[in-house]
């Protein structure tokens, strides 16, 4: 059943009334998909390929949608949605570039397969219509305990000198253990915290207790990750969100407190946590006592820097930024002639280059814009840009401010770390694209504006009842 522009739908609450077995199974599989998105570090090998649990869960979820007669038609309709088709075109172009230029199809196929799983995950969640809010609700509930656990492991790992270091990595450049928890790396851990917190902020204080809890724990998690980009992206994302809401408020008056409570709470939390980090004891100096099997204890050299130095160390000529610039220069050597337009094949940089300063280690570009240009050329970058434009067109009008904030945050973060392939990105995207629900409050003038400006989404052709 097709609904009209800005048709409000109810986001079902699984526990508010008895539901069918199909609904229960779908809900549990959505839970599994979101939970697996927090477990990016865990994987296993199959036929020489590394398979991640965050890839397995979406396959099971989409498989259920296919075999279940009640959801199969919705999924098939969603596969014709412009967002899905545009991303499919991007994958197809990557496949063409890979066949033409990749020196190892196996390495490229692994990433192409991952992108295909992302496509199916996005289509599957979109096909749920209003029920896609389940994924958003679950992710928002995960973020507080995940942030708190990350900060706890950061303190434990550094106070024990790595004696207990689960969920952390040692940054030898700054002599500090940084939190990644169950994510692939600290940058990804921090980015996940930022994205889910922004979605929580967009709820405009409807769950103030959880918002306050996030405002306390998420900044601690960012400090634990020791990721400067994440702190910057969090503040920038909040600024974009508030700025967009203020501009729109001129035409559609809304209570100022409704959309400023969350941003103010988080910014205060970031400032307090950042300030507290500067006065923490030098937690990087503690080391476990040498055992009887050790002939000499680890010696801290004069060049070692204290742990809290990392967040305040903004160095564009060396350190992390300098390393990425070195990688970009190596990549630029291959982005010439026909390869500038058509790329070098998906995931092929490591087949041609070693990591700067790490002989024998396959190179990784890490920076998403450079990665796309290297893999798929200007054509691939243009298709991906078109994908972004199509997504923007189909985001409901009331969700545009937070969509702009997340887009700006993702673009900024992607210049230093690429999480494009990870499932959390596609879960967040599906949350932005889901139909508007009745709990997304608005004033009378705003509602009238929506009827004129919001484009009807194909998500609303998934059998959701009119109300």
Language-model features: locations:
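Hydrophobic transmembrane alpha-helices and their immediate junctions
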Residues: 8, 13, 374-410
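Membrane-interfacial loop-to-transmembrane alpha-helix junctions, especially the N-terminal start
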Residues: 20-30, 74-89, 135-142, 210-211, ...
């Amino acid at each position: 059943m097709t609904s009209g522009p800005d048709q409000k739908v109810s986001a079902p609450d699984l526990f508010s009334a008895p539901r069918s077995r199909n609904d229960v199974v779908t809900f549990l599989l959505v839970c599994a998909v979101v939970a697996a998105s927090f477990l990016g570090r865990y994987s296993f090998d199959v036929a020489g390929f590394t398979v991640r649990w965050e890839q397995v869960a979406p396959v099971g979820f989409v498989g259920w949608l296919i075999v279940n007669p009640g959801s199969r038609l919705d999924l098939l309709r969603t596969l014709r949605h412009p967002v899905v088709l545009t991303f499919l075109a991007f994958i197809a172009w990557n496949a063409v570039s890979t066949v033409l230029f990749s020196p190892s199809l196996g390495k490229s196929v692994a990433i192409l397969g991952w992108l295909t799983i992302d496509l199916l995950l996005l289509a599957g969640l979109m096909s749920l219509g209003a029920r896609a809010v389940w994924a958003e609700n679950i992710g928002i509930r995960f973020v507080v305990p995940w942030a708190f656990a990350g900060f706890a492991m950061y303190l434990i790992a550094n106070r024990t000198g790595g004696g207990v270091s689960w969920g952390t990595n040692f940054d030898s450049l700054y002599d500090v253990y940084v939190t990644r928890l169950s994510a692939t790396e600290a940058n990804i851990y921090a980015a996940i915290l930022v994205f889910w917190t922004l979605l929580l902020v967009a709820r405009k204080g409807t769950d103030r207790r959880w918002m306050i809890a996030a405002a306390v724990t998420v900044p601690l998690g960012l400090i634990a990750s020791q990721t400067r980009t994440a702190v910057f992206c969090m503040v920038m994302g909040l600024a974009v969100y508030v700025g967009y809401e203020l501009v729109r408020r001129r035409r559609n008056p809304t209570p100022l407190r409704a959309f400023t409570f969350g941003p103010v709470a988080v910014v205060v939390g970031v400032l307090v946590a950042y300030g507290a980090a500067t006065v923490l004891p030098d937690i990087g100096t503690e080391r476990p006592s040498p055992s009887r099997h050790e002939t000499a204890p680890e010696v801290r050299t004069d060049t070692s820097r204290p742990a809290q130095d990392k967040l305040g160390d903004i160095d564009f000529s060396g350190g992390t930024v300098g390393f990425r610039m070195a990688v970009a220069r190596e990549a630029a050597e291959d982005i010439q002639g026909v390869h500038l337009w058509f790329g070098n094949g998906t995931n092929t940089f490591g087949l041609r280059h070693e990591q700067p300063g790490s002989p024998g280690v396959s190179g990784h570009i890490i920076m998403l814009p450079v990665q796309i240009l290297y893999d798929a050329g200007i054509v691939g970058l243009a298709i991906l840009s078109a994908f972004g434009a199509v997504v923007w067109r189909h985001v409901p009008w009331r969700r545009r401010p937070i969509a702009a904030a997340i887009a700006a945050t993702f673009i900024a973060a992607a210049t230093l770390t690429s999480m494009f392939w990870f499932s959390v990105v596609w879960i967040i995207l599906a949350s932005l694209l889901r139909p508007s629900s009745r709990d997304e409050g608005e004033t009378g003038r705003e509602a009238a504006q929506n009827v004129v400006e919001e484009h009807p989404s194909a998500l609303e052709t998934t059998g959701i009842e009119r109300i």
